[in-house]
């Protein structure tokens, strides 16, 4: 029997499964990209067309050559004796795949190929074969790769994955061949060797997985379901052989005692599944019923296999994403509680849903559902399956303990902590402070800031430079956690971490979660609430300690306007010295925090004003005059509550002028910002008495970072 070279195409990711499938048909093949290649007879190729659950196209290899221009292409196609492949009265169509270095237009390649074939027939027979793009007798495929053109003659006119049973489908249909692939990968063929195989799809949708499982259980050749299947009408086609093989396939079907069950919460989808099941002729094996996956019960006498392809997160669920995650959390609970000994496979592109199951995966395999990359996650439900949820604290401890085994650089960091603490101790004893900066990127390789808040540490990681390996930066961060715990004798749970970098859009100044854990700290004669876990900052800026004291001293028994007041810490210090304060901030959250700070210090909030407003807009309409104003704007802000974006370098002149309009003639404006390259407006310097007080406002614990802020005392000229 004459031998040919055939290429059998398939979806990316299932090449090895296809190779194994051909082995079961007695065909030895080689794995290629998106398919396999084998040497064999037309009979072998027919067997693949009839029995393969995984193949897309079976193609006879005609020729391959290097082609660098359109003349080369025409001559190459003309060199093939097309009359050996099909008669002039047979129609054909051309399909193109791949990419070629010299041909950007596949329409051109198709046209040139057609011209070469038609010209050859016309020159020999004075007739030409016709093109039929809808229902051709033969399909010629050109696959382009770099400068090579591979020519194939397709045995199956339409794709083999089409089974014709899927008349009704849901929103996100799974290709029949991919459903078959994940069943095989999940172990359905092995399950079929049991006395009573069991398969469940708890989110069955329109039933594709169930039907493919039933076809395998009943040994139904997929081609028998494709009512529109058409084999090529080539001179190589052996109709008698083809018909005999089809008859053998029909007679090879068997009765099975397999139990195949599908569940879904949507009655409309279940109705589609039921109709597809009848269309496929497997209603004697497959049953479906309505049930929430979170209520899944094991009503079976032995262990089996669960295979499902749930909706892919946001693609289908959108605003109901939380509901999807809850579904998977419940699914994981049902599996671990009621399906001991079962095997489970879940195909999804949405990893968060898998995490919610809290089960250990035993295997992960990549598949493609069309262009969508998906992962098949497999589980074995046993005593080791349930994955204990690891808290962030437990994760930090585990990684921190492991990180110090990888290098010794952390020893230098530990020594620096000890040295800094020893240096600060006399000053801390003198001031009685319990909150201070202990370390600020003193060693470049440990780019962190360590702030002490009594028994707590606020550890801020500066964004690593682009030239620094991100894995090394992360390793050093965890080494810092370990050494803070060990060197400073701080409990791991009291080490609170944050990455310091410019925030974008919704990342700016929003709560990260709802932990709401507040702690009380002392600063001189004041007490404040701080929060280490829920906000980007703790509620107090330690580097502003001295300017808060200056403001409070100047405002003693006077009026204070605190602009961009944050949590009103400067207002509290001033109020404790008898000042009547007005605090203005856009954030109601921080103003409420500020009120709590007042009450913590036994200050009557009714005697003070707290105003939620855009400071610039408020200043433009304010008529009151104040003895002291503290103006401490952010470097940059694009809050939706503001009328415009705030850029401190650009806008400080406007801000200062507006603030001075609210200042009494003998008053003081304290202006502060944290922009390191800040330059005071020459017009402001000319218009008012301005004194830079950076050095006065720099505390002992911030001496290593002298550019941390810009502080100015501004008065009217006499």
Swiss-Prot record:
Cross-referenced InterPro entries: 23SrRNA_methyltr_KL, DNA_methylase_N6_adenine_CS, RlmKL-like_Mtase, RlmKL-like_Mtase_CS, RlmL_1st, SAM-dep_methyl-trfase, SAM-dependent_MTases_sf, THUMP_dom
Protein's UniProt keywords contain Calcium: no
Sample GO molecular function, one term: rRNA (guanine-N7-)-methyltransferase activity
Record has rRNA processing as a keyword: yes
Gene Ontology cellular component list: cytoplasm
Source taxon at top rank: Bacteria
Predominant location category: cytoplasm
Swiss-Prot/TrEMBL catalytic activity: guanosine(2445) in 23S rRNA + S-adenosyl-L-methionine = N(2)-methylguanosine(2445) in 23S rRNA + S-adenosyl-L-homocysteine + H(+); guanosine(2069) in 23S rRNA + S-adenosyl-L-methionine = N(2)-methylguanosine(2069) in 23S rRNA + S-adenosyl-L-homocysteine + H(+)
Keyword line: Cytoplasm, Methyltransferase, RNA-binding, rRNA processing, S-adenosyl-L-methionine, Transferase
Subcellular location: Cytoplasm
Domain THUMP: 44-155
NCBIfam families in the cross-refs: PRK11783.1
Role noted for this protein: Specifically methylates the guanine in position 2445 (m2G2445) and the guanine in position 2069 (m7G2069) of 23S rRNA.
Recorded family membership: Belongs to the methyltransferase superfamily. RlmKL family.
Name of protein: Ribosomal RNA large subunit methyltransferase K/L
Species whose genome carries this gene: Francisella tularensis subsp. novicida (strain U112)
Gene of this entry: rlmL
């Amino acid at each position: 029997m004459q031998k040919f070279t055939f290429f059998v195409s398939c979806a990316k990711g299932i090449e090895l499964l296809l190779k194994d499938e051909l082995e079961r048909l007695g065909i030895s093949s080689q794995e290629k990209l998106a398919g396999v290649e084998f040497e064999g007879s037309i009979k072998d190729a027919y067997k693949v067309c009839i029995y393969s659950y995984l193949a897309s196209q079976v193609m006879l290899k005609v020729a391959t050559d290097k082609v660098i221009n359109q003349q080369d292409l025409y001559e190459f196609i003309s060199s093939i004796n097309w009359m050996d492949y099909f008669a002039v009265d047979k129609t054909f169509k051309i399909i193109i795949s791949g990419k070629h270095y010299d041909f950007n237009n596949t329409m051109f390649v198709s046209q040139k190929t057609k011209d070469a074939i038609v010209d050859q027939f016309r020159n020999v027979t004075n007739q030409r074969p016709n093109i039929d793009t809808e229902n051709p007798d033969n399909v010629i495929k050109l696959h382009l790769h770099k400068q090579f053109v591979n020519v194939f003659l397709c045995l199956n006119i339409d794709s083999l994955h089409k089974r014709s049973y899927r008349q009704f489908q849901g929103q996100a249909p799974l290709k029949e061949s991919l459903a078959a692939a994940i069943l095989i990968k999940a172990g359905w063929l092995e399950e079929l060797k049991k006395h009573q195989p069991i398969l469940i799809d708890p989110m069955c949708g329109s039933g594709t997985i169930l039907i493919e499982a039933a076809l395998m259980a009943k040994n139904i050749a997929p081609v028998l379901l494709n009512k529109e299947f058409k084999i090529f009408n080539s001179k190589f086609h052996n109709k008698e052989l083809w018909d005999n093989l089809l008859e053998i396939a029909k007679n090879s079907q068997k009765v099975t005692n397999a139990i195949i069950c599908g569940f879904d919460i949507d009655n409309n989808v279940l109705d589609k599944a039921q109709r597809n099941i009848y269309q496929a002729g497997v209603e004697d094996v497959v049953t479906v019923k309505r049930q929430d996956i979170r209520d899944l019960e094991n009503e079976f006498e032995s262990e089996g296999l669960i295979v499902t392809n749930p909706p892919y997160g946001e693609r289908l669920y959108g605003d109901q994403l939380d509901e999807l995650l809850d579904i998977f959390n419940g699914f994981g609970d049902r599996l671990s509680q009621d399906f001991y000994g079962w095997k489970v496979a879940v195909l999804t592109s949405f990893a968060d849903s898998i995490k919610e199951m809290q089960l250990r995966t035993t295997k992960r395999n990549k598949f493609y559902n069309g262009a969508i990359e998906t992962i098949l996650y497999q589980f074995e439900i046993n005593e080791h399956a349930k994955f204990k949820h690891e808290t962030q604290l437990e994760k930090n401890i585990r990684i921190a303990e492991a990180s110090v085994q990888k290098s010794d650089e952390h020893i230098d960091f530990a020594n620096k902590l000890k040295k800094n603490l020893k240096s600060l101790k006399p000053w801390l004893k003198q001031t009685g402070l319990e909150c201070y900066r202990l370390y600020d990127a003193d060693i470049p390789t440990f780019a962190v800031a360590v702030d002490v808040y009594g028994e707590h540490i606020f550890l801020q990681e500066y964004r690593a430079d682009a030239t620094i390996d991100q894995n090394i930066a992360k390793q050093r961060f965890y080494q810092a956690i370990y050494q803070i715990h060990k060197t400073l004798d701080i409990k791991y749970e009291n080490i609170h971490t944050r990455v310091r970098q410019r925030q974008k859009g919704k990342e700016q100044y929003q709560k990260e979660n709802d932990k709401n854990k507040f702690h009380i700290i002392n600063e001189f004669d004041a007490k404040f609430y701080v929060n280490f876990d829920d906000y980007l900052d703790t509620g107090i800026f330690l580097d502003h300690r001295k300017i808060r004291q200056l403001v409070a001293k100047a405002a003693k028994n006077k009026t204070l306007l605190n602009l961009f007041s944050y949590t009103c810490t400067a207002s509290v210090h001033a109020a404790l010295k008898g000042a009547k304060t007005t605090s203005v901030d856009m954030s109601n959250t921080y103003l409420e925090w500020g009120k709590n700070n007042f009450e913590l210090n036994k200050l009557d909030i009714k005697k003070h004003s707290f105003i939620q407003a855009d400071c610039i807009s408020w200043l433009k309409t304010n008529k009151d005059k104040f003895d002291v104003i503290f103006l401490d704007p952010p470097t940059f802000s694009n809050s939706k509550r503001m009328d415009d974006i705030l850029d401190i370098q650009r806008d400080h002149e406007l801000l200062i002028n507006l603030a001075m309009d609210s200042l009494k003639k003998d008053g003081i404006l304290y202006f502060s910002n944290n922009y390191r390259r800040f330059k005071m407006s020459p017009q402001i310097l000319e218009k008012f008495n301005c004194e830079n007080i950076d050095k006065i406002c720099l505390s002992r614990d911030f001496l290593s970072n002298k550019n941390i802020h810009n502080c100015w005392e501004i008065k009217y000229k006499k």
